[in-house]
Amino acid sequence: MADITDIKTIIYTEKTLGLQEQGVVVIQTSPKVTKNGLKEVLKEYFGVTPLRINSLRITGKVKRFRGKVGQRDEIKKFYVKLPEGVSLENTEA
């Protein structure tokens, strides 16, 4: 099961601010979080039942530093459609 500590941040960019007008919030989490796990966390900690959840997995880029090969962390983003008039900003966690 997912935990509140698995949610890293809510993403605020030009694209996501436009989506927020439509009631969609973009949340960045660790890769192990599932849709059902995120739904449970939103219900438990924020008291919000999402209407729809879409997920997007982003693999870490391979980078070189001083001749050594490394890889950035993988992340997972969720596009969460909230009921009309509800936002995560006006709820207490």
UniProtKB/Swiss-Prot annotation:
Q: Which keywords label this protein? A: Ribonucleoprotein, Ribosomal protein, RNA-binding, rRNA-binding
Q: Name one Pfam family in it.
A: Ribosomal_L23
Which HAMAP family does the record cross-reference, listed alphabetically?
A: Ribosomal_uL23_B
Taking the record's annotation, the residue ranges forming a coiled coil are none
Which Gene Ontology terms cover its molecular function? rRNA binding; structural constituent of ribosome
Q: What does this protein do?
A: One of the early assembly proteins it binds 23S rRNA. One of the proteins that surrounds the polypeptide exit tunnel on the outside of the ribosome. Forms the main docking site for trigger factor binding to the ribosome.
- Segments passing through the bilayer: none
UniProt cross-references to InterPro entries, sorted A to Z: Nucleotide-bd_a/b_plait_sf, Ribosomal_uL23-like, Ribosomal_uL23/eL15/eS24_sf
- GO cellular component terms listed in the entry, alphabetical order: ribonucleoprotein complex; ribosome
Protein's gene: rplW
Query: Superkingdom, according to UniProt?
Result: Bacteria
Give one GO biological process term: translation
Assembly, in brief, is: Part of the 50S ribosomal subunit. Contacts protein L29, and trigger factor when it is bound to the ribosome.
> What name does the UniProt record give this protein?
Large ribosomal subunit protein uL23
Which protein family is named in the record? Belongs to the universal ribosomal protein uL23 family.
